[in-house]
Amino acid sequence: MAFAGLKKQINKANQYVTEKMGGAEGTKLDLDFMDMERKTDVTVELVEELQLKTKEFLQPNPTARAKMAAVKGISKLSGQAKSNTYPQPEGLLAECMLTYGKKLGEDNSVFAQALVEFGEALKQMADVKYSLDDNIKQNFLEPLHHMQTKDLKEVMHHRKKLQGRRLDFDCKRRRQAKDDEIRGAEDKFAESLQLAQVGMFNLLENDTEHVSQLVTFAEALYDFHSQCADVLRGLQETLQEKRAEAESRPRNEFVPKTLLDLNLDGGGGGLIDDGTPSHISSSASPLPSPMRSPAKSMAVTPNRQQQPCCQALYDFDPENPGELGFKENDIITLLNRVDDNWYEGAVNGRTGYFPQSYVQVQVPLPNGN
C-alpha cells in the first residue's frame, strides 16, 4: 500500500510537470464547473474578510485589540484564565464625566449634575454596545466561522482530491497503463467530481441561510441605534432642564478678599496695625530677590525625574500581536507589570509586552515590581 501510494504521488507530480512544462493536455472540466469554482474561491475570500472587518467594526481600536490578544496569549502560556473586555469609547467617556462631575460636587453645581447625567447616559450606551457585540458574535460571526471551518473546508478538500485524481487518471491514460488501472482511476476521478460539484452547489445555493444572517445583523444594528436614540433623547431633555435651572438661578455676588481678611500678622508683613502700609524706601525693591538659593535649586534629585525603566539584556523578536520587540542595550520605559513573567513597556514610540527575563530593571515601577 505504501509503495502504491508513493507511485501514485509520483504519477501525479509527473503529470503536473508535463502539463505545465511540456504542454500536455489534461482533462478539461466544463464551464459550469469552472464558474462554480470561481464563485467558491470568492466565497472563501469573502468569509475570511467579512469576519475580519466585522470584528474591526465592533472593536475599531487596533491597539486595544492587540492588547487583548497579547493578554489572552500570555494567559494561555501562564495557564491563567484572564477575561479582558474591550474598552468601549462610550464607557471611557462616561467614566471621565462621572469622575469629574462627582469631584466638582453635585450639591452646588448644575454643571456637575449635568456631567453626571451625561456620564450615566453614556454608560447605558456602552452596555447596549456590549449587547450588540454579543448578538453579532453569536448570530453572525459564529455561523461564518462554522461555514469556514466546516462547509468550505470540506468543499476545498473535495476539490483538492479531485485535482489529484484527475492528474492520476490523465497520467495513466497518457502512459497507456492497463485497462483496469485506467478504469479504476477514472472511477475515482468521477467520484471526486461528483462530490466536488454537489458540495459547491449546496454551498452556493444556500442563499436563504446567508441572507437570514445578514437580516439578523441589520436587526441588531437597528436595535442598538434605537436604544441609543432613546437614551440620547432622554439625556437631551434632562440637559435642557439643567440649562433652564442654571439660567434661573440668581447670580451670586463675589467680593474678592484682601490680605486684611486673611488676618495676617502685621509684624514684618509690611502692614501696620491700622492697615496702613509702612514706609518703604524708594531705592529698595518691595519684592524678594528672584534668585533661588543654589542649595535649594539642587534639592530636586535626578532620581525623582527618572521614569521606571529597564535595559535589554538580549534581542527580543515578537512572535504574537501586542508584543514589543527591542535590541540588546535598548532602554525601555516600564508602563505596567502584567504578571510575574511579563512587563508592558515602550521604546522608540512603540508599546507592547515583553518577558522579564530579557531585561534588567534599572528604575523599578512605583509599586516596587
From Swiss-Prot:
<protein>
    <recommendedName>
        <fullName>Endophilin-A</fullName>
    </recommendedName>
</protein>
<feature type="region of interest" description="Disordered">
    <location>
        <begin position="275"/>
        <end position="297"/>
    </location>
</feature>
<dbReference type="GO" id="GO:0016020">
    <property type="term" value="C:membrane"/>
</dbReference>
<dbReference type="Pfam" id="PF00018">
    <property type="entry name" value="SH3_1"/>
</dbReference>
<dbReference type="GO" id="GO:0050803">
    <property type="term" value="P:regulation of synapse structure or activity"/>
</dbReference>
<dbReference type="GO" id="GO:0097749">
    <property type="term" value="P:membrane tubulation"/>
</dbReference>
<dbReference type="InterPro" id="IPR004148">
    <property type="entry name" value="BAR_dom"/>
</dbReference>
<feature type="domain" description="SH3">
    <location>
        <begin position="305"/>
        <end position="364"/>
    </location>
</feature>
<dbReference type="InterPro" id="IPR001452">
    <property type="entry name" value="SH3_domain"/>
</dbReference>
<keyword id="KW-0472">Membrane</keyword>
<keyword id="KW-0963">Cytoplasm</keyword>
<dbReference type="InterPro" id="IPR035824">
    <property type="entry name" value="Endophilin_A_SH3"/>
</dbReference>
<dbReference type="GO" id="GO:0005829">
    <property type="term" value="C:cytosol"/>
</dbReference>
<comment type="similarity">
    <text>Belongs to the endophilin family.</text>
</comment>
<keyword id="KW-0175">Coiled coil</keyword>
<dbReference type="GO" id="GO:0016191">
    <property type="term" value="P:synaptic vesicle uncoating"/>
</dbReference>
<dbReference type="GO" id="GO:0098978">
    <property type="term" value="C:glutamatergic synapse"/>
</dbReference>
<dbReference type="InterPro" id="IPR036028">
    <property type="entry name" value="SH3-like_dom_sf"/>
</dbReference>
<feature type="domain" description="BAR">
    <location>
        <begin position="18"/>
        <end position="248"/>
    </location>
</feature>
<keyword id="KW-0597">Phosphoprotein</keyword>
<dbReference type="InterPro" id="IPR050384">
    <property type="entry name" value="Endophilin_SH3RF"/>
</dbReference>
<dbReference type="Pfam" id="PF03114">
    <property type="entry name" value="BAR"/>
</dbReference>
<keyword id="KW-0728">SH3 domain</keyword>
<dbReference type="GO" id="GO:0097753">
    <property type="term" value="P:membrane bending"/>
</dbReference>
<dbReference type="GO" id="GO:0097320">
    <property type="term" value="P:plasma membrane tubulation"/>
</dbReference>
<feature type="coiled-coil region">
    <location>
        <begin position="227"/>
        <end position="249"/>
    </location>
</feature>
<dbReference type="GO" id="GO:0061174">
    <property type="term" value="C:type I terminal bouton"/>
</dbReference>
<dbReference type="InterPro" id="IPR027267">
    <property type="entry name" value="AH/BAR_dom_sf"/>
</dbReference>
<comment type="function">
    <text>Required presynaptically at the neuromuscular junction. Implicated in synaptic vesicle endocytosis.</text>
</comment>
<dbReference type="GO" id="GO:0009267">
    <property type="term" value="P:cellular response to starvation"/>
</dbReference>
<dbReference type="GO" id="GO:0150007">
    <property type="term" value="P:clathrin-dependent synaptic vesicle endocytosis"/>
</dbReference>
<dbReference type="GO" id="GO:0005737">
    <property type="term" value="C:cytoplasm"/>
</dbReference>
<keyword id="KW-0254">Endocytosis</keyword>
<dbReference type="GO" id="GO:0048488">
    <property type="term" value="P:synaptic vesicle endocytosis"/>
</dbReference>
<feature type="compositionally biased region" description="Low complexity">
    <location>
        <begin position="275"/>
        <end position="294"/>
    </location>
</feature>
<dbReference type="GO" id="GO:0000045">
    <property type="term" value="P:autophagosome assembly"/>
</dbReference>
<dbReference type="GO" id="GO:0005543">
    <property type="term" value="F:phospholipid binding"/>
</dbReference>
